[in-house]
Amino acid sequence: MKVAIIFLLSALALLNLAGNTTAKVIGKKANCPNTLVGCPRDYDPVCGTDGKTYANECILCFENRKFGTSIRIQRRGLC
């Protein structure tokens, strides 16, 4: 009986510790306007957290809105 109680308490403690983990957020959030009609044709490449190079930050925002994704800017420049 004592062994079962100790086992149960240990299992609960491990489950509690496992539930407290948080996901690490990678990259910088893109500066996206609330209304996005179109994007300028300026070439100022950004590397998304999906490993794809976008022509500019606006294009990344447009793709996020179009496909319902939340790709962030990993860095400025080509991937």
Curated annotation (Swiss-Prot):
Presence of the UniProt keyword Secreted in the record: yes
Tissue: Seminal vesicle.
Residues annotated as signal peptide: 1-23
InterPro entries per the UniProt record, alphabetical: Kazal_dom, Kazal_dom_sf, Prot_inh_Kazal-m
Disulphide linkage map: 32-61, 39-58, 47-79
One term under GO cellular component: extracellular region
Site feature Reactive bond for trypsin, where: 41-42
Subcellular compartments: Secreted
SUPFAM superfamilies found in the cross-reference section: Kazal-type serine protease inhibitors (SSF100895)
GO-annotated molecular function: serine-type endopeptidase inhibitor activity
Marked site (Necessary for sperm binding) residue numbers: 43-44
UniProt keyword annotations, A-Z: Disulfide bond, Protease inhibitor, Secreted, Serine protease inhibitor, Signal
Domain Kazal-like: 26-79
Known role: Serine protease inhibitor which exhibits anti-trypsin activity. In the pancreas, protects against trypsin-catalyzed premature activation of zymogens.
Protein name: Serine protease inhibitor Kazal-type 1-like
Organism: Rattus norvegicus
